[in-house]
């Protein structure tokens, strides 16, 4: 049996960072979202025992090939749809509670399904909000989607769970690519949908209306380190509605996280404290806030960081290779086969 609880996470200045979710117990094998790994840099992201994405790391560790499985039987049934009454209930709690309440809403949705979608670990939901890009040519203009930029709010302390996303790294939601190379050196993190949406669906029109009214719930994404990508868990139609309206949405980023402490270096502490005392003696008017911040940094040894677990169950990857080969051939993507299987980046003719 699986049970869970959450707590609001604050930085040392008491600014809200997000919602920490602890999951304990046992999840039936193969039902939760999980990463599998094997030899030759081969990976698979699975849901309910079926692969959502296959991945193959390049041999020079400069990127990863992603193959999207459009045939997954549960693509459209991951979470229950957000209803109008859900939006109204959260609106009644006020603007200040909007983001935190959506974190709680999605935590419940992920865990209260008949088979919880999160494995027993520590999880974190953090907001990633529209931000300005520091480019002079964007001044006094309305940026197009390629110029959108999103980041987590700033925090005090050593919190290594900060996210960023560029609009130019959005992938098509109406006709997602079967195969994509993620460049770890020159590209940003990709935003990957799990299935193609219907651009004529009635709910898309409804979400466009909510977007114009400023009532669009956040898009829920999962950051997966091994894929260097954000995978949309909930909100494909909300995201597309925002793109069509030209109004940047907000995101909630789900990730695994861990907390550790730096080892104590007493000699370093003593050196810094002597230097600060000397600074105050020589300059009584020095910035006390700066000195206090240095002391806080000196004694605060905790740091929070994101991680992604995987189960090493793919072995030598022969079964993985058979699945990928059959899938790419069914969809006329054989031109990518050699690169995906071998972790290479040779020129590929357009496979359509």
State where each predicted segment sits.
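C-terminal catalytic or substrate-handling cores of phosphate/nucleotide-
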Residues: 309-352
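Surface-exposed polar/charged interaction patches
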Residues: 93, 108, 112-113, 210, ...
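Amphipathic, charge-rich alpha-helical segments that serve as recognition/docking helices
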Residues: 258-322
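Short glycine-/polar-rich loops that comprise or flank the Walker A/P-loop
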Residues: 246-249
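Short beta-alpha junction loops
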Residues: 224-226, 253-260
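Short alpha-helix boundary/capping and kink motifs at helix termini
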Residues: 19-231
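A sequence-level detector for short glycine-anchored, His/Arg-bearing signature motifs
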Residues: 229-244
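N-terminal intrinsically disordered, low-complexity regulatory segments of eukaryotic proteins
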Residues: 3-23
């Amino acid at each position: 049996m699986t049970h869970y609880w959450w707590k609001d996470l604050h930085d040392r200045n008491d600014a809200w960072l997000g919602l920490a979710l602890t999951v304990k117990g046992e999840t039936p094998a193969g039902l939760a979202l999980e990463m599998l790994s094997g030899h030759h840099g081969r990976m698979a992201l699975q849901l309910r025992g079926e692969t959502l994405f296959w991945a193959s790391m390049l041999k020079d560790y400069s990127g990863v090939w992603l193959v999207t499985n459009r045939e997954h039987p549960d693509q459209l049934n991951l979470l229950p749809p957000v209803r109008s009454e859900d939006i109204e209930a959260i609106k009644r709690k006020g603007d200040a509670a909007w983001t935190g309440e959506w974190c709680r809403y999605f935590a419940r949705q992920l865990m209260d399904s008949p088979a919880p979608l999160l494995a027993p670990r520590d999880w974190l939901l953090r907001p990633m909000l529209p931000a300005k890009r520091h480019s002079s040519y964007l001044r006094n203009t309305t940026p197009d989607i390629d110029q959108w930029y999103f980041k987590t709010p700033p925090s005090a302390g050593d919190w290594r769970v900060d996210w960023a996303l560029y609009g130019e790294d959005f992938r098509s939601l109406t006709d997602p690519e079967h195969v994509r190379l993620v460049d770890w050196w020159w590209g940003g993190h990709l935003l990957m949908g799990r299935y193609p949406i219907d651009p004529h669906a009635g709910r898309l029109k409804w979400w466009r209306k909510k977007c114009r009214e400023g009532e669009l719930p956040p898009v829920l994404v999962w950051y997966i380190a091994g894929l260097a990508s954000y995978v949309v868990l909930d909100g494909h139609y909300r995201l597309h509605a925002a793109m069509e309206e030209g109004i940047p949405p907000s995101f909630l980023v789900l990730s695994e996280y861990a907390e550790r402490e730096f080892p104590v270096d007493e000699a370093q502490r003593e050196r810094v404290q002597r230097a600060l005392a000397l600074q105050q003696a020589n300059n009584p008017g020095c910035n006390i806030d700066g000195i206090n911040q240095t002391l806080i940094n000196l004694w605060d040894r905790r740091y929070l960081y994101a991680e992604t677990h995987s189960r090493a169950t793919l072995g030598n990857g022969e079964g993985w290779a058979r699945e990928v080969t059959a899938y790419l051939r069914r969809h006329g993507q054989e031109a990518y086969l050699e690169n995906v299987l071998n972790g290479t980046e040779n020129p590929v003719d357009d496979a359509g």
